[in-house]
Amino acid sequence: MRTLKALTTCAILTLVATSSLTVTADEAVNTSKATPLILEKNEGEKRLWRPIEGAKGWNAVPGPFILKVDRHNGGSSHLVFGTEDIPPGESIDRHRHPGADEILFLQNGHARVHLGDRTREVHGDATVFIPANTWIEVTNLGTEPISFVFVFSAPGFENFMRAESTPEGQKITPLTKAEDAQIQKEHGHAVIYAEP
């Protein structure tokens, strides 16, 4: 099962990476400043979401995520790849990404996915393709955290993630609602959240 998950993740990364590039035979040699990476499950840039003052649920606690591949991690200028967990009963709030397609690979658990105008319950090993500008919301319906992999076809959202988080091991200071609103305004090209 782990081999299948690893192969599926590699296939997703290959698909996203190659779909956003047009390469001629003369350009086939890696001339970018990207660095090949081999990472274990818990390796990468570990960060914790900063809680938002006065928020409830997931936005009120520092949740972990790992940025694995982007401009700062491996030097990729074409995609963003990372992992995150959704605690039981919590949701990734309804949002959309104007500038990038996204793929979510739910590695375990039981979730309700609202995607555009469709809703479906899915279980571990489910893949969700989210075209740019499509509304998405994911709710953990199970009793254990859901682990998922995310891949973006273009950079941008990782900058929002860094702005709203703290590196693991550093003091976590809550965001005020004004700070959260300013960060969302600055990164509106990468993510837009639905009004509560």
Model regions and ranges:
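Bacterial N-terminal signal peptides that target proteins for export
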Residues: 1-10
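Bacterial N-terminal signal peptides
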Residues: 10-19
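A short, N-terminal "cap"/entry segment at the start of jelly-roll beta-barrel domains
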Residues: 23-79, 166-196
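Conserved short histidine dyad/triad with adjacent acidic residue
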Residues: 65-70, 82-97
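Ligand-binding loop in jelly-roll beta-barrel domains
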Residues: 75-76, 112, 132-158
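Glycine- and acidic-residue-biased ligand/ion/polar-headgroup-sensing regions
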Residues: 99-101, 105-111, 116
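Short acidic-glycine-tyrosine-enriched beta hairpin
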Residues: 117-133
